[in-house]
Amino acid sequence: MRNYSVIVTKAAADDAVEIIRYISDNLKNRKAAERHLELYLDTLNSLKEMPGIYGISTMEGLYERGIRLAPFGNFDVAFTLDEQNATVTVLRVLYAMSDLSNKFKKQ
């Protein structure tokens, strides 16, 4: 099985920290924050082994850029896949019910 390098951008790392911190501090649910962190890390690990199982999103603004979404809990890891160089680039970690296409139009 082919292994892929996973690069997490600063924006994605900041998103993940903000999500975990919000759940822990604002919602006062440390256990849920720990579960979400574990799910996030599991998702990153799955991208190392089989990123192709997540298809390119059909949402406007994402499809054109080849952005794929890997769900975990109520969130999505937005990433691109470079098969030729066996590289996954994690762009953002966002609430799944947010207007994802609008967030990527701004970038």
Predicted features and spans:
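Residue-level signal for pocket-adjacent positions within structured domains
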Residues: M1, P51, Y95, D99
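Arg/Lys-rich, positively charged N-terminal/basic patches that mediate binding to nucleic acids
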Residues: M1-L39
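Compact soluble domain cores
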Residues: L39-E49
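Basic/aromatic recognition patch in beta-strand/loop cores that engages polyanionic ligands
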Residues: M50-Q84
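Enriched for short, Lys/Arg-rich terminal
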Residues: F72-D76, T80-Q107
